[in-house]
């Protein structure tokens, strides 16, 4: 007889709120009886151009070698990342699955039962999951009205048990950048690691990675899911002090980056034109959406915009758009985001025009 055995599960696991992803094309097609080919998916901040053709070819070329393990430490990819970022290989970690794998590895490396992590909200929901799984406790600090952080408030929330402070720049779901002076203040007044999530940094005017050369407690996480269009391959990387990278590699799961992901990542880094075009579409798209959507739209440095549909509710407006085959993200699942915010990915001009018309209709009908 097979019985449920919850006593075998770590108690910390039961405190974890399940991660809520954006809706899939299949879900919406089934729910509303739509042709999947007609659906516009702008809820997960994916690249509307798709992956680089060079990356696609590189993936295909690995098929005959599926029986062979990739390099344990993804050294070829790290060498390519060194050329891309300007950092030595000794400062670079490649991670699968995606940047989430980097977060998992970092929490596993430093968090013990009873330790704390600081999470300014609203922000990317995943940070607390690996921390809780390792026995850590998330301490949430509410962002200001404009979604900026108050460094003093953040530092006041730390304690002797604080191991990681999670920051996001551009922040998800608000799209605003973390000022360098605020990051420096946090770094200089804590013994904890400070993790800066730069998943969307290629779309922004500036990055914060260079500070890794100055501070031995700064880690910058990045992904191939956004500008490189490789979300389905689950590939990320970290830029961190050499002392930490050595220990991370010691504790990391070997072969975490698959051979197709490794080769596609190298090829994507080499395709400068695809990257430039992806950035151009995102920047033009977010500008268009900010100007045309008939609700308050926050300034963004990412490949998405945050829309406040007050006095309407985000769920109702999101549902109105989904009925028309347009997937956007209601932000009510983001802690402290409230119930009136919607995140919409910047798509192609044709897609953006349809999104604007759908928001206009929702404003009249919802």
Curated annotation (Swiss-Prot):
The keyword tRNA processing does not apply. Its cofactor is pyridoxal 5'-phosphate. The modification N6-(pyridoxal phosphate)lysine is found at residue 226. It catalyses: L-histidinol phosphate + 2-oxoglutarate = 3-(imidazol-4-yl)-2-oxopropyl phosphate + L-glutamate. CDD domains: AAT_like (cd00609). Pathway: Amino-acid biosynthesis; L-histidine biosynthesis; L-histidine from 5-phospho-alpha-D-ribose 1-diphosphate: step 7/9. Keywords: Amino-acid biosynthesis, Aminotransferase, Histidine biosynthesis, Pyridoxal phosphate, Transferase. GO terms for biological process: L-histidine biosynthetic process. Gene3D superfamilies: Aspartate Aminotransferase, domain 1 (3.90.1150.10), Type I PLP-dependent aspartate aminotransferase-like (Major domain) (3.40.640.10). InterPro entries: Aminotransferase_I/II_large, HisP_aminotrans, PyrdxlP-dep_Trfase, PyrdxlP-dep_Trfase_major, PyrdxlP-dep_Trfase_small. One of its GO terms (molecular function) is pyridoxal phosphate binding. Its EC number is 2.6.1.9. Belongs to the class-II pyridoxal-phosphate-dependent aminotransferase family. Histidinol-phosphate aminotransferase subfamily. This is Histidinol-phosphate aminotransferase. It comes from Methanosarcina barkeri (strain Fusaro / DSM 804). The gene is hisC.
